[in-house]
């Protein structure tokens, strides 16, 4: 009897609230009301008045509201503001109540945008709160404009931050300064545990303060947080310093900015333990390699150049270059800016005018010393070389604030030119001191190595339409060579050009690192100095552990491009005629430029990819049907694990016998022929042959034929696949964009009913001519839904008039 008594007690409490609310409403009605042009409105219902009163006093009544019976609570939920509605979610679920419809209505009324049709919203509360956080942060929504958003007892940012899984920073880094401000410290701490994806869109030039705020934000969210993915979109003219800052922070490198306070979390983590020589390798984790000499020196340079008003003296030309073998080849191939030369920077004692040290420290070991170039007879050690910024300015200049910060970032990048591959020591010309191998950094006035730290890094990096200059490409390549935590890399329309050779070099070095986790690479661009198949071979050789490779080149390669110095070809270690070693590819997607492709090159990749499960060829053209048949024969012999095969925008009108070979001999689960002109020639003869092959194929589960001008006759012929004498297990059929009319679809539905095969899965009917007879189309779809799940649309078939004329 305890539960009914509690229920009655809560009901009585609610009645008391109702009575008080009624008296308050009656007293207000007794007061003279203002005249209204629309006339007096109907008085609200008693229950609604009670709900409003409860909602207005939730600060006092919250615990009582949570204990209300389900039917009463269900009527109060739509009257609560978003803060209490979010807080009561768990209680509502326990009582069997859902708030999803309320959150959806709030989205429609307040956000006033419609989600993408491709987006499947599983939780409208999380979606609303995430969008609400972004709008409040950017100042695009006024919380005081709607009582459902305004409550003095709650902070909009703090309350919604725990629902944020994806944050977008736009334009001039709006929101970064607000998030790192002290009043929002708890907001940032919550974001550090909830945020997984950080996106940058349409970035513009930003000031020093904004970049410093971004530095602190990235340090908190990536190094001490849970962010695992960073994506950059649509940045036509990247600001070098900002771009390099985002990349280096994403890779786990951290140096406090000039004048910034020490990181509280870093202090807590390092409190109570003494720094050691292996500090860098400990921060990398057990699976990450220790930083090499060039990287440590670059990080040390970043720490020492935070001095204001430090003048540089005019630089002399270097007597020897700091080179890496593969990088030097790349520079020879890709060329360098004629205005950019290698200049040695002034060391700290040269820049400040102080006296240099009287002696240089000894090398770390005899074996290390023996690999170095002979030291100069001059007793004074020469400064470390680096690239000069492409500003066109020479001579002394004052470095202050952002200038020093920008120089530090460039120092970090271009020291990479001195890194030797395969673990070899660096040749520093006449600098014989052991600074670069970490033996004594003080010989160049650098701090101890412990001043530079590397923290947690992201696992997914995406660059969409972000042109990469030579400096930016060098930055990316250097970071990639030791970025062992990276699992997925997407480079889309970045204008790499000849920098693709540097990228391949860095990926090859990364693949050799212990614990390398890169398993997915998505690469697309307008042009490539290598033909797409040679580029694919080079990538597969460089990354034998890759699981997913998606590559697209829109325009043909030009080997005789005058931009390549002396018409030099690619390095011999990047392309070659030797056999491709066995790899771990499971998914391969290729988008080809116009022009016939050499089938043997594609076959060589397929032969080395015995684990391939999914293959997609887009716009591929072969010299003859025999070449296409050679590819299919290779798939049959070497790719026994292949489950999904897709062809898009390929002219297969002359490859009908090869298509029949595919259907009869490959044990696939899904085949896609998208806009392949499959039935353009001999449809009356080819369709029955194709249907017969499919009826005997018991492994095929999905067939996609969009854009092949199937028509009513072809659809009715295809219906025979589901006849009683068929052994086909087809359960997914896509016949979108196939000039199908309502009467043909109705007859197709009747045949399926006649054979009584039962539900066979999904049927897609997008962009067909079903609007020519709406009644017949509805009847056909009604009959089909008894057999399968139908997905269609209300497409205007007049848009396909040109296609109709071409089939007459």
Curated annotation (Swiss-Prot):
Keywords tagged on the record: Leucine-rich repeat, Phosphoprotein, Repeat, Ubl conjugation pathway
Modified residues (Phosphoserine): 155, 276, 326, 369
SUPFAM superfamilies: RNI-like
GO biological process: protein ubiquitination
Comp. bias regions, Basic residues: 383-397
Domain of life, source organism: Eukaryota
Pathway assigned in UniProt: Protein modification; protein ubiquitination
Skewed-composition ranges (Low complexity): 357-379
Role, per record: Probable substrate recognition component of an ECS (Elongin BC-CUL2/5-SOCS-box protein) E3 ubiquitin ligase complex which mediates the ubiquitination and subsequent proteasomal degradation of target proteins.
Domain note: The Elongin BC complex binding domain is also known as BC-box with the consensus [APST]-L-x(3)-C-x(3)-[AILV].
Name the record gives this protein: Leucine-rich repeat-containing protein 41
Cellular component terms per the entry's GO annotation: cytoplasm; nucleus
Quaternary context: Part of an E3 ubiquitin-protein ligase complex with Elongin BC (ELOB and ELOC), RBX1 and CUL5. Component of a probable ECS(LRRC41) complex which contains CUL5, RNF7/RBX2, Elongin BC and LRRC41. Interacts with CUL5, RNF7, ELOB and ELOC.
Native source organism of the sequence: Rattus norvegicus (Rat)
Phosphothreonine, modified sites: 327
GO molecular function, one term: identical protein binding
Segments annotated as LRR repeats: 483-503, 514-526, 527-551, 609-631, 632-655, 697-724, 727-748
Gene expressing this chain: Lrrc41
Coiled coil (UniProt feature): none
Region (Disordered): 269-289, 304-404
Region described as Interaction with Elongin BC complex: spans on this chain: 45-54
């Amino acid at each position: 009897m305890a539960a009914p008594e509690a229920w009655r007690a809560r009901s009585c409490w609610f009645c008391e609230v109702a009575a008080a609310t009624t008296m308050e409403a009656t007293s207000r009605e007794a007061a003279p009301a203002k005249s209204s042009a629309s006339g007096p409105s109907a008085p609200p219902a008693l229950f609604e008045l009670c709900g409003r009163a409860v909602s207005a006093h939730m600060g006092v009544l919250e615990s009582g509201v949570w204990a209300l019976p389900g039917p009463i609570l269900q009527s109060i939920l739509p009257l609560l503001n978003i803060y209490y509605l979010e807080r009561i979610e768990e209680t509502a679920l326990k009582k069997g109540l859902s708030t999803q419809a309320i959150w959806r209505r709030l989205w429609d009324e307040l956000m006033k945008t419609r989600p993408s049709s491709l987006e499947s919203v599983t939780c409208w509360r999380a979606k609303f709160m995430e969008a609400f956080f972004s709008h409040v942060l950017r100042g695009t929504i006024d919380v005081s404009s709607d009582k459902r958003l305004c409550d003095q007892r709650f902070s909009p940012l703090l309350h919604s931050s725990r629902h944020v899984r994806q944050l977008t920073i736009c334009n001039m880094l709006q929101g970064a300064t607000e998030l790192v401000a002290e009043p929002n410290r708890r907001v940032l701490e919550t974001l550090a545990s909830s945020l997984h994806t950080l996106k940058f869109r349409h970035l513009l030039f930003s000031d020093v303060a904004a970049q410093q705020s971004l530095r602190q934000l990235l340090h908190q969210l990536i190094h001490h947080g849970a962010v695992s993915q960073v994506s950059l979109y649509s940045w036509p003219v990247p600001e070098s310093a900002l771009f390099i800052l985002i990349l280096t922070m994403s890779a786990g490198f951290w140096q406090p900015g000039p004048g910034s306070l020490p990181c509280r979390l870093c202090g807590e983590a390092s409190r109570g333990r003494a720094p050691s020589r292996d500090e860098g390798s400990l921060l990398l984790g057990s699976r990450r390699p220790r930083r090499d000499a060039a990287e440590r020196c670059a990080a040390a340079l970043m720490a020492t150049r935070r001095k204001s008003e430090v003048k540089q003296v005019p630089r002399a030309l270097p007597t020897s270059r700091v080179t890496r073998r593969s990088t030097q080849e790349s520079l020879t191939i890709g060329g360098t800016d004629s205005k950019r030369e290698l200049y040695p920077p002034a060391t700290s004692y040269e820049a400040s005018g102080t006296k240099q040290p009287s002696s240089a420290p000894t090398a770390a070991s005899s074996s290390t010393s023996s690999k170095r170039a002979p030291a100069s007879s001059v007793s004074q050690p020469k400064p470390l070389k680096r690239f000069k910024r492409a500003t066109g300015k020479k001579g002394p200049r004052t470095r202050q604030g952002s200038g020093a910060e920008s120089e530090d970032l460039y120092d970090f990048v271009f020291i990479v030119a001195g890194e030797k591959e395969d673990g070899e020591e660096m040749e520093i010309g006449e600098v014989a001191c052991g600074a670069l191998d970490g033996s004594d950094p003080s010989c160049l006035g650098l701090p101890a190595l412990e001043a530079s730290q590397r923290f947690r890094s992201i696992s997914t990096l995406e660059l969409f339409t972000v042109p990469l200059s030579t400096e930016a490409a060098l930055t990316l390549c250097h970071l990639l060579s030791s970025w062992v935590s990276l699992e997925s890399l997407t480079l889309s329309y970045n204008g790499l050009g000849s920098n693709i050779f540097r990228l391949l070099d860095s990926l090859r070095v990364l693949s050799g690192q212990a614990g390398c986790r890169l398993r997915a690479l998505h690469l697309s661009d307008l042009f490539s100095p290598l033909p797409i198949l040679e580029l694919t071979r080079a990538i597969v050789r460089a990354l034998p552990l890759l699981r997913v490779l998606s590559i697209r080149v829109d325009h043909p390669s030009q080997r005789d491009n005058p931009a390549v110095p002396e018409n030099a070809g690619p390095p011999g270690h990047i392309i070659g005629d030797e056999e491709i070693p066995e790899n771990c590819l499971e998914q391969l997607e290729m988008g080809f430029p116009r022009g016939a492709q050499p089938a043997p090159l594609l076959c060589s990749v397929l032969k080395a990819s015995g684990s391939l499960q999914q293959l997609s060829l887009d716009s591929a053209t072969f010299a003859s049907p025999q070449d296409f048949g050679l590819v299919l024969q290779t798939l049959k012999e070497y790719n026994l694990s292949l489950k999904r095969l897709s062809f898009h925008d390929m002219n297969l009108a002359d490859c009908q016998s090869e298509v029949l070979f595919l259907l009869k001999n490959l044990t696939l689960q899904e085949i896609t022929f998208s806009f392949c002109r499959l039935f353009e020639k001999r449809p009356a003869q080819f369709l029955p042959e194709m249907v017969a092959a499919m009826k005997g194929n018991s492994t095929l589960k999905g067939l996609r034929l969009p854009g092949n001008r199937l028509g009513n006759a072809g659809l009715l012929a295809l219906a025979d696949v589901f006849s009683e004498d068929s052994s086909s297990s087809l359960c997914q059929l896509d016949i979108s964009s196939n000039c199908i009319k309502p009467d043909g679809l109705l007859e197709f539905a009747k045949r399926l009913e006649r054979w009584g095969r039962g539900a066979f899965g999904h049927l897609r009917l997008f962009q067909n001519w079903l609007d020519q007879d709406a009644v017949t189309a509805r009847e056909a779809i009604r009959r089909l839904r008894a057999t399968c799940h139908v997905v269609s649309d209300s497409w205007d078939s007049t848009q396909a008039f040109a296609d109709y004329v071409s089939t007459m």
